[in-house]
């Protein structure tokens, strides 16, 4: 496919979302227009799209075009699409669950759980497969057509030996075969087919009743059939049933169902303050964004007039992970397949996600998906989460105010390096210089956390603001290891 817990712990992630507040009408209309323009420009028969907000679920959605060219049947909200490689995150999270339960280790050798690789795949680890670092050759054209491969034939393929294009563990190279192997590992350690294990752990708890791996589960009147544009007309792609390669790209779902999955991913943020309890399942979801391998650069896909942005990307667990110039930290994945093309994007630190599902071969709706979240961000609707204030930072507010008003850094607990790096006299001079610009700052500061041991203290003063960046040391009691001052002049 082309890449464009325990029940109690899992239940902590499944609180019913609050009533969804719709997007502002003008913004919603702009997103819808962008989706339809992209579909027309790329000759896509039909598509569905959605915008998801953490805690609220699907806040906007739309459909366009036809689900079946021959029957001229339109796409509807309950139309089901294959999502191809967007399946991989379901597989990875299920594997992480099993690891958390002690049924395997991510650094296990693959041969421990799949004996058929003995002799040629002894060096492979589970982690290699998760991050596409197994040394297998990129296999999109071949791998897509392997979806219905039966278990016995897959075993025969593995026993015969698979050639490597490079040594395992060196670099990222996308491999559908690797995720098919993860499906086999899930089967072997759980004792049931990966489809059943994923459905038990993912689909059913989230209420994704319209989601499955098997076309036989889909009423024909609800299926978006797959098409390719060839010789100036639409050609029907053959349907492929379930099989061993479904773990890399076999999920069939609807827009509303997939929105539940996106909301589930977003619900794992923000993380609890260190030392505070949270459901282990939240940390397991966040582990999907823990990438490995050397970062690769990609230009942010867009069809809008936004500024170019180079995004450094690594591969996590079924998700690509990077830092965008506008959205901040992002996770995303495409899904290309004979007859289908899809894309998803989340910005976990602001709590928003978007997705597009289509029924054209290898359609890559990345650009309108990114454009939608960028438009929401630029409209001021998606600020980053405010990090909770730790006791260490909160307790520093009063000492910091004394430091500013007296010039004596001794009013705060100091780490051993603090006065070595800049002595008390120079630090007093720094404070005098900045207060000369700002004037009196009579009230205690506000505090903004960057982490449990890092933050900014800010004072509203007679002439603008004073902002102090404070970094605490990793000591049992709070001690300043760094302190930097800056003055922000008043706005004209």
Where are the regions that the model predicts?
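Boundary at the C-terminal end of the N-terminal hydrophobic targeting segment
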Residues: 18-22
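Short, conserved catalytic-motif segment at the N-terminal edge
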Residues: 24-81, 100-108, 151-152, 156, ...
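Short solvent-exposed beta->alpha transition segments
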Residues: 408-450
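Exposed beta-sheet edge and beta->alpha loop/turn motif
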Residues: 448-492
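Bacterial N-terminal signal peptides
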Residues: 6-15
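Short, gly/Ser/Thr-rich active-site loops of penicillin-recognizing serine hydrolases
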Residues: 295-304, 328, 356-426, 490-492
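Short, surface-exposed loop or secondary-structure junction motifs
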Residues: 56-68, 121-338
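Short, well-ordered beta-strand elements
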Residues: 333, 343-359, 467-471, 480-486
């Amino acid at each position: 496919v082309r890449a464009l817990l325990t029940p109690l712990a899992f239940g902590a992630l499944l609180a019913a979302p609050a009533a969804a507040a719709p997007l502002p009408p003008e913004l919603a209309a702009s997103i819808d227009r962008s989706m339809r323009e992209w579909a027309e420009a790329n000759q896509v028969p039909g598509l569905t799209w959605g915008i998801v907000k953490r805690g609220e679920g699907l806040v906007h959605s739309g459909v366009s075009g036809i689900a079946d060219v021959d029957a001229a049947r339109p796409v509807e909200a309950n139309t089901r699409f294959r999502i191809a490689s967007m399946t991989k995150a379901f597989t990875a999270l299920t594997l992480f669950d099993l690891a958390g339960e002690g049924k395997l280790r991510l650094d296990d050798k693959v041969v421990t759980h799949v004996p058929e690789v003995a002799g040629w795949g002894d060096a492979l680890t589970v982690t290699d497969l998760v991050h596409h670092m197994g040394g297998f050759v990129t296999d999109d054209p071949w791998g897509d057509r392997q979806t219905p491969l039966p278990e016995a034939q897959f075993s025969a393929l593995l026993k015969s030996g698979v050639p490597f294009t490079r040594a395992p563990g060196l670099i990222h190279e996308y491999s559908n075969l690797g995720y098919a192997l993860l499906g086999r590992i899930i089967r072997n350690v759980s004792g049931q087919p990966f489809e059943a294990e994923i459905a038990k752990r993912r689909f059913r708890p989230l209420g994704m009743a319209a989601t499955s791996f098997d076309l036989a589960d889909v009423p024909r009147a609800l299926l978006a059939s797959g098409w390719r544009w060839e010789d100036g007309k639409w050609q029907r792609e053959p349907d492929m049933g379930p099989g061993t390669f479904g773990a890399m790209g076999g999920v069939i779902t609807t827009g509303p169902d997939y929105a539940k999955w996106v909301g589930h991913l977003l619900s794992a943020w923000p993380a609890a303050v260190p030392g505070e309890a949270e459901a282990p399942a939240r940390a397991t979801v966040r582990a999907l964004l823990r990438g490995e391998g050397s970062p690769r650069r990609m230009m942010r896909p867009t069809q809008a007039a936004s500024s170019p942005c180079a995004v450094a990307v690594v591969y996590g667990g079924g998700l690509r992970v990077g830092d965008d110039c506008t959205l901040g930290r992002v996770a995303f994945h495409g899904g290309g397949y004979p007859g289908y093309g899809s894309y998803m994007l989340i910005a976990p630190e602001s709590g928003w996600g978007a997705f597009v599902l289509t029924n054209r071969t290898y359609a890559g709706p990345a650009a309108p998906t990114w454009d939608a979240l960028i438009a929401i961000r630029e409209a001021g609707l998606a600020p980053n989460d405010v990090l909770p204030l730790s006791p260490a930072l909160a307790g520093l507010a009063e000492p910091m105010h004394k430091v500013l008003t007296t010039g004596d850094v001794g009013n705060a607990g100091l780490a051993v390096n603090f006065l070595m790096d800049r002595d008390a006299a120079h630090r007093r001079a720094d404070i005098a210089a900045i207060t000369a610009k700002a004037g009196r700052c009579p009230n205690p500061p506000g505090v903004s956390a960057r982490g449990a041991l890092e933050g900014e203290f800010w004072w509203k003063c007679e002439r603008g603001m004073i902002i102090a960046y404070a970094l605490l040391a990793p000591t049992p009691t709070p001690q300043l290891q760094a302190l930097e001052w800056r003055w922000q002049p008043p706005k004209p």
